Amino acid sequence: MTLAQSNLLLLLTAAMWGSSFVLQKMAMDIMEPFIYNALRFTLAALCLMPIRYFRRGNIDVIKSTDKRHMLIGTISAGTLMFFAVAFQQIGIKETTVSNTGFITGLYIVFVPMIGVALGHKYNPKIWLAILIACSGLYLLSGMDGLYMKKGDLFILISAFFWGTHLIVIDMISHRHHPIAFAIRQFFVCGILSLFAALITGESLIVPSMEGWFYICISGVVAIALGYTFQIYGQKVTPPSQAALIFSTEAVFSAVAGIYFLGEVLGSKALIGCLLMLGGSLMAQFYPPLNHRMTEQKSLS
């Protein structure tokens, strides 16, 4: 695969992820968030299992110590993913697809904030990037003083968990095959979502074929296929380029929200989106100064 083909594959992935916010919002009109997450992440895990099976011959046998590491890692990552998608689905009911896409993109800004707490050192300019992104959030959300709309607040909490999830993935996934790791964390997320659905008394019955359509497209295309595209694309595209390409996810979400749902971005909100995107992109140029670089295990 050439670099141009790889970049195109990652751009397609960003488009799939950004556009899928429309389906996530429409799904909330006919079903509840926890059972929706339970079904789509379980379906995604099942879709990835054949890929893992046919590639198993190229992977070394996992040692017992790595099995324990895999278990702890996937439970941690899957739990963080559960909280991230739970807050995201609850929040998207109360806000627009455009806001969801751009606020979710702030996970890139949360990474250095969390990293500092873990002892990572950053270029001081990273705080300028964070300030720019936060200014954009203020404009996009139409905040009155320190008050933020409930839906946007839930999406912001979701972005925090996505940032934490990214740090955990960076710390542990380099020791394991990416598809195997993904399957396990998707199952953990799906199981926890099912428990949450039971505890909160959600209906476990999908009310219509329309609901199954949203589940299948999200589970098969956005999660399973999107993740696979990401893995193959990042085998060729450098991390810095990949991060820039993935930042377009927010743009695709805004375009999808405007085209499919008739959402409107006012001038203040549009400026906020640009500031958030700019702050997130700026944050990409200041990685931790004292953090090791890791590589994912190859699929081949």
Residue ranges and their predicted role:
Residues 18, 22, 78, 82, ...:
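Hydrophobic/small/kink-forming positions within alpha-helical transmembrane segments
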